[in-house]
């Protein structure tokens, strides 16, 4: 039986429906907003696993090309492996929901939201969060939800709830806010140097709409929700738990405060190993081993948190608002176009910049249509960065961290008109002990400045943490990996000296209040300004010149009606020019022409040729041409592809010329001056006037 609930999301009508589609799933919801629709399902495995200390949750968002009536591109007409955008939306759904599942449920949970219709006006990521939460809420899977999300944009001096794609492009800030009735559980967004107060205003705007969307889900649950499965606490108990606790706790409390990540881990492992040897026979049982590991995790959690709340003592000895020592260096690699190393404590990022032509940009085949990105940032996290062995390659984490750093730096990247290059930044994480994505923002800024990219302002990032027992709390600046793992919040903020450009927050408690977030933002600003001051001591402005190994690029405009003349039949003209000058020539529909190549003179010569080809010949100007044919009365010279003129024998020299071939040869490149255009449009050229420099115009030989 079909059950429906209607409401609004921002100014747009919203439909939630269940009981008709995907009925064999534990829970399924069809959500529609205008012409965009999401089908979200959730299933759990039948078999329960004992002793898990995490939630085995997988979210696989996917978007179908049929949603917009589009055929998939490429040879295979079927959706393939998840695109980066699908992975990012999957993470966006996972993060606010994961803390609300019961760890002791012990079953694999699979959430599959699918975009099955899109009007290409309304973004479907926040709709997928609502649909996924609704599916879990009315399922039989235990869940401390519902969760809802809205996007808030700041546009023309006011906040807009769930803006359209065009409104997002014009906004100075856009942020996705997810939460429950109790408060906010996730924040992610980007901005163009906005203040902390403006961001907090967006969070306040979001909360009322989140509550309304949670109410819609509860109403649907009241109509067709299933009875929740009972969470049965694990019957397995660690044998000798109290004795193990007594043996390990005091030694672990000392080991956790060894200086240095490696030293701490070694000291803690030694304690664990010594205690395990005393219970070796018992720990051969897999369940007992998992319970033993869980107890040590519980003790580390307790020690770290109590020392921070009771004594303000962090494991590396810092004050709660202190930043680790910072070291910056640029120009660390000889050949790349720009490079820098940023080290903060035991976190280190090597960022390398490559400059390319505009045609080198990344093309994305989204369901809304193709788009080109001319600022690219790739984040790599090899296992050696944490002293481990493991699989090399790009996972969801790398894509997510790279997206955050990309968003944080995008606000300061120059427009193509100012800097007509594709810019690629690669961050290699060489060491990691917390906040590697924010280290990427810092190293990325340094490498861009070293490469000569005229960014608007330097950007720095910092990760904030939270420890709370429900009454007391401590906000930590520049958190370590252990503080992230054992803490209650990871709040990353990036920006310039004048405002925020990127942010991301995840919490492990049910919600975080707006007042606490305000305090965290203010503390983050102080830390960010400190980091920027250190970075500015190394490099504070773009290098005057780009690398001699970078391609040379000229960008200019031609008349739109001349684009066809430049391209030529079947691309013949532009290909001929590219081959002749050994450059790459690209043309946009608005008449923007970009010429790129390794040699500056070749790029300049090609530009001159394009300008000459696409403008009407002017009497009095000097052109560089090629002798095409020699006849008795002179030579025909091609001044640009398809345009020839006659250089009469009398215009070859001041003295008498008996044979034209005594002066010129076919294929010879010469400069000629256009001295006349007759009534039939024929061009009359002069070699001697060009040699004597009587041009009054452009000398293309320079």
Curated annotation (Swiss-Prot):
Domain KH, chain residue ranges per copy: 551-610
Query: Which keywords, in A-to-Z order, does the entry hold?
Result: Cytoplasm, Magnesium, Metal-binding, Nucleotidyltransferase, RNA-binding, Transferase
Q: What is its main location?
A: cytoplasm
Q: Name any cofactors this protein relies on.
A: Mg(2+)
Gene Ontology BP annotations? mRNA catabolic process; RNA processing
Pfam families tied to this protein: KH_1, PNPase, RNase_PH, RNase_PH_C, S1
> Which InterPro entries did the record assign?
ExoRNase_PH_dom1 (IPR001247), ExoRNase_PH_dom2 (IPR015847), ExoRNase_PH_dom2_sf (IPR036345), KH_dom (IPR004087), KH_dom_type_1 (IPR004088), KH_dom_type_1_sf (IPR036612), NA-bd_OB-fold (IPR012340), PNPase (IPR012162)
Q: Transmembrane residues, as ranges?
A: none
Q: Mention one GO molecular function.
A: 3'-5'-RNA exonuclease activity
GO CC terms of this entry = cytosol
Q: Which residues form the S1 motif domain?
A: 620-688
Q: Where in the cell is it found?
A: Cytoplasm
Please list the reactions this protein catalyses.
Answer: RNA(n+1) + phosphate = RNA(n) + a ribonucleoside 5'-diphosphate
Q: Which family does it belong to?
A: Belongs to the polyribonucleotide nucleotidyltransferase family.
Q: State its role.
A: Involved in mRNA degradation. Catalyzes the phosphorolysis of single-stranded polyribonucleotides processively in the 3'- to 5'-direction.
- Protein name, entry field: Polyribonucleotide nucleotidyltransferase
Q: Which organism is it from?
A: Treponema pallidum (strain Nichols)
